[in-house]
Amino acid sequence: MPTNFTVVPVEAHADGGGDETAERTEAPGTPEGPEPERPSPGDGNPRENSPFLNNVEVEQESFFEGKNMALFEEEMDSNPMVSSLLNKLANYTNLSQGVVEHEEDEESRRREAKAPRMGTFIGVYLPCLQNILGVILFLRLTWIVGVAGVLESFLIVAMCCTCTMLTAISMSAIATNGVVPAGGSYYMISRSLGPEFGGAVGLCFYLGTTFAGAMYILGTIEIFLTYISPGAAIFQAEAAGGEAAAMLHNMRVYGTCTLVLMALVVFVGVKYVNKLALVFLACVVLSILAIYAGVIKSAFDPPDIPVCLLGNRTLSRRSFDACVKAYGIHNNSATSALWGLFCNGSQPSAACDEYFIQNNVTEIQGIPGAASGVFLENLWSTYAHAGAFVEKKGVPSVPVAEESRASALPYVLTDIAASFTLLVGIYFPSVTGIMAGSNRSGDLKDAQKSIPTGTILAIVTTSFIYLSCIVLFGACIEGVVLRDKFGEALQGNLVIGMLAWPSPWVIVIGSFFSTCGAGLQSLTGAPRLLQAIARDGIVPFLQVFGHGKANGEPTWALLLTVLICETGILIASLDSVAPILSMFFLMCYLFVNLACAVQTLLRTPNWRPRFKFYHWTLSFLGMSLCLALMFICSWYYALSAMLIAGCIYKYIEYRGAEKEWGDGIRGLSLNAARYALLRVEHGPPHTKNWRPQVLVMLNLDAEQAVKHPRLLSFTSQLKAGKGLTIVGSVLEGTYLDKHMEAQRAEENIRSLMSTEKTKGFCQLVVSSSLRDGMSHLIQSAGLGGLKHNTVLMAWPASWKQEDNPFSWKNFVDTVRDTTAAHQALLVAKNVDSFPQNQERFGGGHIDVWWIVHDGGMLMLLPFLLRQHKVWRKCRMRIFTVAQVDDNSIQMKKDLQMFLYHLRISAEVEVVEMVENDISAFTYERTLMMEQRSQMLKQMQLSKNEQEREAQLIHDRNTASHTAAAARTQAPPTPDKVQMTWTREKLIAEKYRSRDTSLSGFKDLFSMKPDQSNVRRMHTAVKLNGVVLNKSQDAQLVLLNMPGPPKNRQGDENYMEFLEVLTEGLNRVLLVRGGGREVITIYS
């Protein structure tokens, strides 16, 4: 249940002594006596656990820094100087967030530190190329072109490549939204989607990678048994009940042996797999080059590859050589080997198959070449049912009534019933592998640059290869050869190999090693993915798979991966495993697009991808395309995959560990009702989800109208319609007397909110004092998770005026309240000069003066403002101050690197502030400030004296009148003394009580300024001079707001310091962080 507690003062004193009373009542057991002065919770700047820096180190080092920043010295323990922060943050090396990494020994850690970082080409482009180009290209693409025709094949490839391109765009946006952890794709997805969706998608990704291993192993065995060594088959067609059944049994036996062998290689050492990766990649590249070389050669010198036809039916040439029925030798005829296959004997009089007798045997060129014109014949699809003849269009054929022995004759038959949807499912795995680059994010020099560039270039390259191969295969190869899946009409040779130049063995050997390498890569990556999911602890029953060998190798995860991979191998058919693989990868890609779309639509402040070429409509299109492809491939597989993902989601939701990763899905909870409120109330949001939920404190005039309406304009510009906005105000008095005024004030505020397009809630409090009302608002505004974390208010411009001498007291106490509540504070000075929503700045700068680090609000606010049309054309500049001991050149480089990782575009300038003597102006200004402070106190004492004196005279006059009335009724008693007040006595009594105060006023002109105040004033004057020099013409200046002094006797001096700090600037926003990080470099 949502709970709200409001702290109210025990006893309110007009002179501000209620704070001390409240402190005394909090500790009734404290022994009496003088207490040492302790800062109250609002005086400092309490820090929460920071995702940026180690607070212990900061506290140890802060003693030595900031010697020239006296205005901020009381907060150095919590707010470090910028130079110290940049030194820790800018030169990080791949931090892993959210996962307990295995403790590696010092030697391996030293080796990793020395390992060279990879660039875009080696680190992303080539691995993606190797993973995308694979077994389907070599073993199935020609068959897909033959069955679906060039047009439909082109459509299939275009759909799949478009799907992966859109997914790559979404993935690039996610990958460049902060530092990509070394965990790769799983961490990127899970940290964007949250533990429930992240775990479900992570397991789908794991199962897809595991089944990919099974598919590659089956491809390896198919190449080996069909094209390299057919004689190595253990099961023969006669014993196994048919050639297809024998092939399946052989695949299972050889596949299992290969899986065990590969698993042993992975178990012994992954380094061998990584070393062989370039060799396997070279095989792929050489094979593709051989294909293009063969196409070029076929245009002017086609290879002599005859294909034998009986009628219009294609014959398998595994059992005969000559494509003739009989030979003519010396005027005598002799039957051929083909005759013996179709007849009961080799004699010319033997009984033969009816179709064999009725039709002629012809021979055509299997690869007529690019100039042959065969392209038009291959344009259209030729789908057929299982067991159908592979027939050539346009060749005459005499049909026969009944053919019972067709399967036993040497025809080329279709092994499965083909359809458009089946071909999509079989082909899609050939475009997966786009996340190979992000999986290596820990080894990249600049992951934010390399991942989008390398991945998209790899997809463009492979899409070009696939689409061009479809056109070239259709233009060079005869249709019946394309539809011959296993090359039976080519004497058992690989179709694509016969096209290649200089030799078919280039393709056969190249494809064999490339599929071997891809299988090894899958068996290497899948266990690590499972280990990462297990170590996250979101799926309790998988935690055992998070353990491994002493060097961190995932032994148990490898064992489970091998078992799951074995189930794919037992299926034994590449065409059956591929659609299963497609489902898991499509599910994964769907959620990547969903994550990007959700983050874009939510406009979370942390969503600042460095990759700019994305849009939520592209992500939505990619998500829709993934969903469509899932159901196109197989509707029952699609439903099964979604059911599996849904079950995992619900399991993690109800049984999994509580995780908070700053994901985009959880941001949707702020737009929901009770259920979402209860979910977001569990704790503060993750740094990545932090956005300013603003409580705007408005001042009202005597007619309950808003004094500073442009404060609401600024609020709407800052919020841009997103997040929570509470507009609050306080009326002095009692609610019974002021409820009509309160309603009128609330109507005025709502009307102004509507005019300024500020979407939010209005909350008005009637309180006996302005101070208490503001405190109540800060404590209790909002509900559950919909609570503010930032307070926005206007600077009290009249704090020096005599008609409002104590407005500064409410202001300083409000600063302390926000600090104690861990809330950020924004103070707009000269708020009436801030722009309205209708105005547009055509240029100019938003200048940020980053003096101390208090959570990153200074960087976040300009980014949010620049989303609005008013500030969009303004450029952002960040200034920071270097002191004598700082290396300003290195500071600038570090700050540029830091902003690069924050994905914020800004000009950077480091301003050097040398230590110099305190000027006479600073002394004079400090002296004037302290004299005014003392004078205010003396005036307050004089006012109290006057009030007490007037009350005394009133009492005495009342007493004298009562005595006179009594004398008319009774005689005077002798023991009473009658006092007579003359004018002289009254004046003497009056001025005698003021002697002390007059002497106090005389002392003001002989006092010397306090040295700590002089140093603070020195800082304020120097900073103001530097800011004026650089930012006098800026459209907006953002400054760190120093905290109020721990000694509350100097509150009015604090106001003077802020006044001096911002003097001469047009629009100023003073920013004070809420004690927690609000911006992060992580994705």
UniProtKB/Swiss-Prot annotation:
Membrane protein topology class: Multi-pass membrane protein
Activity modulation: Activated by N-ethylmaleimide (NEM). Inhibited by furosemide, DIDS and bumetanide. The inhibition is much stronger in the presence of 50 mM K(+) in the uptake medium. Inhibited by DIOA. Inhibited by WNK3.
Cytoplasmic topological intervals: 1-119, 173-196, 441-450, 532-554, 599-612, 652-1083
InterPro entries on file: AA-permease/SLC12A_dom, KCL_cotranspt, SLC12_C, SLC12A_fam
Reaction equations catalysed: K(+)(in) + chloride(in) = K(+)(out) + chloride(out)
Region (Scissor helix): 664-680
Residues bearing the modification Phosphothreonine: T30, T973, T980
Disulfide bond positions: C308-C323, C343-C352
Binding-site residues, chloride 2: V135, P429
Alphabetically ordered keywords of this record: Cell membrane, Chloride, Disulfide bond, Glycoprotein, Ion transport, Membrane, Phosphoprotein, Potassium, Potassium transport, Symport, Transmembrane, Transmembrane helix, Transport
Tissue expression from the record: Detected in muscle, brain, lung, heart and kidney.
Protein task: Mediates electroneutral potassium-chloride cotransport when activated by cell swelling. May mediate K(+) uptake into Deiters' cells in the cochlea and contribute to K(+) recycling in the inner ear. Important for the survival of cochlear outer and inner hair cells and the maintenance of the organ of Corti. May be required for basolateral Cl(-) extrusion in the kidney and contribute to renal acidification.
Protein name as catalogued: Solute carrier family 12 member 7
